[in-house]
Amino acid sequence: MKLLSGLLLCSLVLGVSSQRWFSFIGEATQGAWDMWRAYSDMREANYINADKYFHARGNYDAAQRGPGGVWAAKVISDAREDLQRLMGHGAEDSMADQAANEWGRSGKDPNHFRPKGLPDKY
């Protein structure tokens, strides 16, 4: 746990560079909330073939917050995919999820992954 905390702190320090700390931390917090909201919506929707859309949407929304949001989205996405791989989920699906994550983080429209019939609420 100490190692993970240390790596997270180092990643934060390196990610900030000359950014103002409070701005970066605020963006990261809001970005993490955006990721949580997309995950919650995915669970609520429980819609077949919609996971890539929610991955892209969460990363997109977080990245719109600024560099802190991009950092939070990358850390959360990478940690989630690493955990999925450790639990034995397929590497192909993980790679597809990461592609959707990167798509959203780069500012591209997450609706590219939106499945037909997904309620407008999402």
Curated annotation (Swiss-Prot):
Tissues in which the protein is found: Detected in liver.
Name of this protein: Serum amyloid A-1 protein
Gene3D superfamilies: Serum amyloid A protein
Top-level division of the source organism's lineage: Eukaryota
Main location: secreted
UniProt keyword annotation of Aminoacyl-tRNA synthetase present: no
Renumbered residue ranges of the record's region Disordered: 87-122
Stored SMART domains: SAA (SM00197)
Any one Gene Ontology molecular-function term assigned to this protein's record: heparin binding
Annotated family: Belongs to the SAA family.
Chain intervals with Basic and acidic residues compositional bias: 105-122
Organism lineage string: Eukaryota, Metazoa, Chordata, Craniata, Vertebrata
Reported function: Major acute phase protein.
GO biological process per UniProt: acute-phase response
Subunit structure: Homohexamer; dimer of trimers. Can form amyloid fibrils after partial proteolysis; the native, undenatured protein does not form amyloid fibrils (in vitro). Apolipoprotein of the HDL complex. Binds to heparin.
Encoding gene, per UniProt annotation: SAA1
Keywords noted in UniProt: Acute phase, Amyloid, HDL, Heparin-binding, Secreted, Signal
Organism: Oryctolagus cuniculus
Cleavable signal peptide: 1-19
Chain residue ranges for the region called Important for amyloid formation: 20-45
GO cellular component, one term: high-density lipoprotein particle
Subcellular localization, as worded in the UniProt entry: Secreted
Induction: Up-regulated by inflammatory stimuli.
PROSITE patterns according to UniProt: SAA (PS00992)
Clinical disorder: Reactive, secondary amyloidosis is characterized by the extracellular accumulation in various tissues of the SAA protein. These deposits are highly insoluble and resistant to proteolysis; they disrupt tissue structure and compromise function.
